[in-house]
Amino acid sequence: MPLLDSFTVDHTRMNAPAVRVAKTMQTPKGDTITVFDLRFCRPNMDILSERGIHTLEHLYAGFMRNHLNSERVEIIDISPMGCRTGFYMSLIGTPSEQDVAAGWTAAMEDVLNVESQDQIPELNEYQCGTYSMHSLEEAKDIAKTILAEGINVNKNDELALPESMLKELDVK
C-alpha cells in the first residue's frame, strides 16, 4: 500500500494548535488545490472530545468559509481527523499559513458567539448522521483553548521523518 503524505511527518514533534500545508497539487486545468492540517491538539497527548469535535465540524466549516473564501480561495471541504486531534481543510488556492491561522482564530471567536444548541447548522436527523451527539459547551471549550494558546505554524521540513526511519517503520 502506498505511504500517504500525512504519515511521513513526525507526529511526536508537531506543535498544536498549528497550521501545516499537508499537500499541494495541480488540477489538469491549472488550479492549485491545497490541503491544510489544522492541528487542534498534540498527537498522542490530547484528543478532542467526541461531541465537541462533532459540533465544531458543523460550525467550523461555515465560519472558515466566511473568513477565507474570496476571489482567490474557495474551501472545498473541512473534515475532522479520525485521530480527533484536528481537521483537514482542502481548498482551491494558496492562502498563507498566516491567513489560515487568522481565519481559524476568527472562526473560534464565532464559535464563542453561538448562543444556543439550536443555532448549530444541520442539527437534525435528516442532515446529520448522529444528530444527538453534539455539545456546544464542549465546542466552546475547544475554541477557548485555541484562542488562549494561539495558533502556530508547523513546517513539513521540520517534521519530516528520515527515509531510514520510514523504512524501519514500514508495515509488512
Swiss-Prot record:
Domain of life: Bacteria
The EC number(s) this enzyme carries: 4.4.1.21
GO biological process terms on file: quorum sensing
Cofactor: Fe cation
Protein role: Involved in the synthesis of autoinducer 2 (AI-2) which is secreted by bacteria and is used to communicate both the cell density and the metabolic potential of the environment. The regulation of gene expression in response to changes in cell density is called quorum sensing. Catalyzes the transformation of S-ribosylhomocysteine (RHC) to homocysteine (HC) and 4,5-dihydroxy-2,3-pentadione (DPD).
Descriptive protein name: S-ribosylhomocysteine lyase
HAMAP family for the chain: LuxS
Binding-site residues, Fe cation: 54, 58, 128
Manner of cofactor binding, per the entry note: Binds 1 Fe cation per subunit.
Subunit structure: Homodimer.
Catalytic activity: S-(5-deoxy-D-ribos-5-yl)-L-homocysteine = (S)-4,5-dihydroxypentane-2,3-dione + L-homocysteine
InterPro entries: LuxS_sf (IPR037005), Metalloenz_LuxS/M16 (IPR011249), S-ribosylhomocysteinase (IPR003815)
Family statement drawn from the similarity comment of this UniProt entry: Belongs to the LuxS family.
